[in-house]
Amino acid sequence: MTISEQIKVLCVRCNISVAELARRMGTTPQNLNSKMKRESFTISDLEYLAETLGCSFERYFVLPDGEKI
């Protein structure tokens, strides 16, 4: 699942539109949709997005044996 698909799922689960998410993040819906189309999010973007939705964003590498680094 792409980051953009994950964001859409989060929005559905949080009962919020992507446009409303953008407004709460202090950006325009056009800007957020553009980032979603290009999959051009920074780690900071994703952390702020998660904070805006009241959830957490965890980043890690996962080795073939399932170990997270």
PLM regions and their residue ranges:
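Short alpha-helical DNA-recognition segment
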Residues: N15-Q30
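Short C-terminal boundary/hinge segments that cap the last helix of small helical domains
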Residues: G54-I69
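Recognition helix of helix-turn-helix/homeodomain-like DNA-binding domains
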Residues: G26-F41
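Alpha-helical residues within the helix-turn-helix
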Residues: V12, R23, E51
